[in-house]
Regions:
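FKBP-type peptidyl-prolyl cis-trans isomerases
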Residues: 1-223
């Protein structure tokens, strides 16, 4: 009988996302990216390591993983509210042209900009009135994903490293994890505030079943 996965399982999964017209906009597979002309040298095309239920990828897709069989391919269609949200007219905002002049930007329809930490796309330009759309570019669209869970990760060290890689955006080869019985010591190349490492330690204990997780900066004594 095929193995099924559940919430809090760590898995390696390949997936490809498509729009209703078949256009590929997201994939973990290099061949699919090249065939769809969206290949980027900056991307690392390999199976994504995901902890089910932690919303490390699109939440609507994450929900689909629970209860699925390892090695079996699935197709799911996500409505806008489970994908990138419905289009919200309130997210269409008028931005004064002076804001663009201050940053020496020439606003043109289709230009993507960051205003106060919000990503938006210039919709129209008319005199001193520039309308910027702060909806996600795929908001309001139904999307389809094809995915396959390749394997379930059982090694505790691999779970620790993969979760911290995703959460802290630190390369996996820069994260050291030592596991002895029911305790783990994590060595990071950056010294994070105690509040952050304490929060991460609690989360890792919850996800891995360890009794204790300690953090230390590289070259420091264990604390």
């Amino acid at each position: 009988m095929a193995e099924k996965v559940k919430e809090k399982d760590f898995v390696k999964v390949d997936y490809t996302g498509k729009l209703p017209d078949g256009t590929v906009f997201d994939t973990t597979e290099e061949k699919a990216a090249r065939d769809s002309n969206i290949f980027s040298e900056k991307m690392n095309y390999s199976p994504a390591v995901v902890c089910i239920g932690e919303k490390q990828i699109l939440p609507g897709l994450d929900e689909q993983f629970e209860g699925k069989e390892v090695g079996k391919e699935y197709n799911v269609t996500l409505p806008p509210e489970k994908a990138f949200g419905k289009r919200d007219i309130k997210k269409m905002k008028i931005v004064p042209s002076s804001t663009f002049r201050e940053h020496k930007i020439n606003p043109q329809p289709g230009l993507q900009i960051d205003i106060d930490g919000q990503m938006g796309t210039v919709a129209t330009v008319s005199g001193g009135r520039i309308i910027v759309n702060f909806n996600h570019p795929l908001a309001g669209k139904e999307i389809t994903y094809t995915f396959k869970i390749n394997e379930k990760i059982t090694d505790t060290k691999d779970k620790l490293v993969s979760f911290l890689h995703f959460t802290l955006r630190i390369p996996e080869d820069k994260i050291e994890a030592e596991v002895k019985e029911d305790k783990a010591t994590i060595t990071l190349p950056i010294d994070f505030p105690l509040q952050i490492t304490t929060m991460l330690a609690h989360k890792l204990v919850e996800l891995t079943g360890l009794k204790d997780v300690l953090f230390q900066k590289k070259g420091a004594e264990k604390k």
